[in-house]
């Protein structure tokens, strides 16, 4: 017999970088899949990628470490891809067949969960192509509400997202470059995002996974510990590959 959605597993698996498997009410959504050991000069120094499957994929923006066609292919070319407007052509040329372009406010239903695209503050270009799209976050609603911030800095609408009760917020806390630039959150900014959003659980992402030639610009453990101390009781730190029942 089918498992009722309310009785199905509800879990967050931090795969690493911006890749998270959100399992909710019988549906698994994977965010920004990066499932390779290496992409360009970025090399995975965390443990190998845990196996993941997806009923749909959420893409936040067009940067190569967030929109990676070889990683998407591992999840199947018929898997629905929910993406910013402007990247469908790139994906169709790579033979992906179910592409759903969205802008902030658009909603998509996958199984028993609803996904709403939200704004984000992050560059949307994809060098060396001419692609330049609006970066997104996503709210996933079912028996739990999960907010995936994508890659973002603080932005005016973030507090309004927190007007809705959020069970789990997935918040980026670092970048891989020598400094955390505009359009990103460092641990202090990420803790401020938690204050604005007021989630029950805040899970840091975009840390501890990839670095240029396996040489992180900052100590990842110190980075995540700083976030956890500033974010307070809501913070739940998952190492790459770790799963939390929610």
Question: Residue locations for each model-derived region?
Answer:
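Active-site-proximal loop/helix segment associated with metal-binding centers of metalloenzymes
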Residues: 117-143, 152-157, 164, 168-170
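Cap/insert and terminal regions of metallo-dependent hydrolase folds
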Residues: 86-89, 156-242
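Short, polar loop motifs at secondary-structure junctions
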Residues: 16-17, 84-90, 103-105
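Zn-dependent metallo-beta-lactamase
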Residues: 1-30, 35-37, 219-222, 226, ...
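Pre-active-site segment of Zn-dependent metallo-hydrolases
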Residues: 2-4, 21-62, 69-74, 83-86, ...
